[in-house]
Amino acid sequence: MSEISSCATQNHPKHATFEAALDKYRTKIAPNLCITGPLNTVELSNIVGLVTRERGEVPIVFIDYLQLLACGVTADQQFIDERLAITACVKGLREISNLYGSPVIALSSTTRKSYDSGKSARPNLAMFGGSSAVEYGFDSVLYLADDNDKPEWPYESPATGTPLKLVALKNRYGTLGESRLDFDGARATFHDRG
């Protein structure tokens, strides 16, 4: 972060690049973002509908994360039972996707049990906490895990960042598989180690 803040000073050699990136963010990215506090799926659906009507484009909905989405009647009325709340959230997100054709990407926690099982057993759909609705309600489920496996090929280059693997646990319209990645934390990017 200190490199970024130092680029903001006018005498820094990367200042022009920093200003260009900032300008691109201001003109292209920021006007297309809608970051909100806790919402229920009805309120979220209203926002998606408004964006679709005003912009003439269907937005992509990112939920960070599913267990924090407010799924009561209003944003401040949560269900008492977490399983019912998660089931209602998944159902509401599916309705938004079906109604507007909007892709929905939701982050979800996993059960505490799965923290240990992820080290030895293959990840599976049962590891998502709270409700089986996560298993059945989404078209695709991806899991990001540490990659402590041996290289698949003898000529595979070693990891240059944090070695991870992205595992497709469910893919309603395609095949399952995994991809080996490097995570570059300083740049918040993933690179395929394929």
Task: Name each region found by the language model.
Residues 1-57, 128, 179-180:
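Cytosolic-facing regulatory segments adjacent to core modules
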Residues 6, 71, 127-130, 183-185, ...:
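Generic structural "secondary-structure junction" signal
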Residues 13, 131-135, 193-194:
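Short, surface-exposed, polar/charged, turn-prone segments marking secondary-structure boundaries
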Residues 31-35, 142-144, 181, 188-190:
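Generic preference for hydrophobic/aromatic residues in regular secondary structure cores
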Residues 37-165, 173:
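P-loop NTPase motor core
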Residues 168, 173-194:
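NTP-binding/hydrolysis catalytic cores, primarily Walker-type P-loop NTPases
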